[in-house]
Amino acid sequence: MNFKKKFILGIFICLCAAFLTAKPAYAIPTVNGGNYTSSTAYDIGGYTDHKSVTGILPAQEICSYFKFTVNADEKIYVRCSHDKSYSNMSVELRDSADYLISKSTRVLDASTLTPFLAVNCDGKKNGQTFYVKVNRGDYDINKPMYFSITLNNRIHSGSGTFSFTGSAVNRGNSSMAYSGVDSSIIKLNLSRESKIPAGAIVKRVSTKSTQSPSQGNVHHILMPESVGNWYTSKVSSATSGSYYISEKDNIPVKQVWQFKYNAKASKRSTMNNVKLNVDWIYDLANTNYKRVL
């Protein structure tokens, strides 16, 4: 199978996948050369997820430029399809003045029907302009090259529930101290949990448990070891806790978590079946641009 047929097959597979997950459909334009400088760049327009254009780099042309805009806080990656015959093909991200930001020659999914190159792009302000430059590399100057450019969201979300080992024991507040008494500490190590994407950051976190005997005036208390600070649950509950933690705190999910609880009752108690519920966000740049489900 020659490279043109493989390219068409690869595009067909990508389009089928895009159709199954698609938002509103749009015609995918084809750009057949002439866009070899930033001033002649093909304008893709504003970023939307999975926005694509098909590119043809004609014989005798060495590069192809595309222009697009992103808004503040949008984090995307530009995906450029590849063929094994395209030796030293590269893709570059450039700023609005055509200065190089990053460049990639690394072929991802090289053994599949849809190998690609990727560069990351982070929007800092609304309507920010970037250029993508596709370079021929060592491929025969007398032959055309076929590829696709796709703009994709990098930030995705997930969630999971994980169980602490053991029981937390509270000796009881026999002195009736106003501040109550903290229990023993139990731990949960998520450092190597394969269900959690690399680089995942906590978006929301909560705990569930069973206290025996059930008491009032109980607060769950949680500590991510990388932070080293204890977070006390927002409200009193013997069975659950939610915390003032968000993605702005930039707390990694994959680490050791510690748990204890505070009780004001005078009698001894234990807390069992302690579970950590985590919602997270993650960047596909940390997972070779693959979703973790």
Regions inferred by a protein language model and the residue ranges of each:
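Sec-dependent N-terminal signal peptides of Gram-positive bacterial secreted proteins and lipoproteins
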Residues: 2-27
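Non-catalytic extracellular/lumenal accessory regions of secreted precursors
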Residues: 25-64, 72-74, 152-185, 289-293
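Beta-rich globular "head" domains
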Residues: 183-217
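Edge beta-strands of jelly-roll/beta-sandwich modules across compartments, strongly enriched
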Residues: 66, 136-153, 266-282
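Solvent-exposed serine/threonine-rich low-complexity stretches and specific carbohydrate-binding patches
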Residues: 99-112, 164-169, 217-219, 226-242
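Beta-sandwich interaction modules
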Residues: 109-125, 236-253
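Noncatalytic modules at the cell exterior or secretory-pathway interfaces
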Residues: 120-140, 248-268
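Acidic, Ser/Thr/Pro-rich low-complexity intrinsically disordered segments
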Residues: 57-118, 125-128, 135-136, 197-198, ...
